[in-house]
Amino acid sequence: PGEIIVPKTTNSAFIATPLEEHLRTLHIHRLVVAGVSTNNSVEATVRMAGNLGFDTYLVADACFTFARPDFDGRLRSADEVHAMSLADLDGEYWTVINTEAVLRG
């Protein structure tokens, strides 16, 4: 009860949803993000949050993704894909943290 539910139809939770409006109305400036899949929906949402000026933290051990082939067709493990997504944008769009840091506050 009292929670805002924001259904989404694209990979970013900000596209064609009222999420940004809700956050701004509530004066929320810092986001802590977790979810599936790191290299798709999570990354798209966090990129957009950064572009919109939110102070964004991605909880690395509260996200996961799936194995997939790279551009050359070599299969990359889910851990490799996850790690590359984290490394690509850490410090640019988000700050990577873990659940222990979240719980410490």
What residue spans do the PLM features occupy?
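Active-site-adjacent betaalpha module
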Residues: 1-105
